[in-house]
Amino acid sequence: MGLLEGFTFLDLSHRLPGPLAGNLLGGLGARVIKVEDKFYQDPFNDGLFSKMDNAFKDWYKGLNNKKEILKLDFSDQEDRRSLEALVQTSDGIIMGLPSKVRHKLKLTNEDLEDLKKPIAVIELKASKSRKNFMHELNALALTGLLKLYVNGRNEDFISPPFLPFSGIAFGQKVGMDLLAGVLKSKKEGKSSTYTLGKKKKNKLN
């Protein structure tokens, strides 16, 4: 029996940090369901990255081998209802969807508050003003090191720096924050949304 058996988490993220966090939870016995839009799948498995380098498909498998993979049509009403049902039974969500898609799927912070149930949400966002948690390439680009890395190289394709230590550390942080959020929401009987480890206060009646 895993330590998190009986807990359910939804992974609505792509690439490295979010999926890694979900897989860590799955390795502890939680039921983790990675939900993807079947027409806009994780680029590590079906998209720009995987087309450039087959190694990304191996990353995808390794980052998601402790989960159920569910591919839905986010424009289909029946599929959206299936997702809503999963949200109702989940303890936490790794949220990597754009705001527009969250509105479409009724997964905004306000929508989740209306569920009137304890649920923790970790939002994965990076920007120039929030530098505590970001992908390797974001950090390299913002500091100018990425330009230095490619300076003087003439190959048609230049592989990114390896290994993605920041992304791996970020994924572990996401998993820890989500567990903390779940404990707090269950104790208080409220939904809680966190952005990169910083809480946004939500109130429920």
Where do the PLM segments sit?
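N-terminal helix-loop segment corresponding to the beta1-alpha1 unit
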Residues: 1-194, 198-205
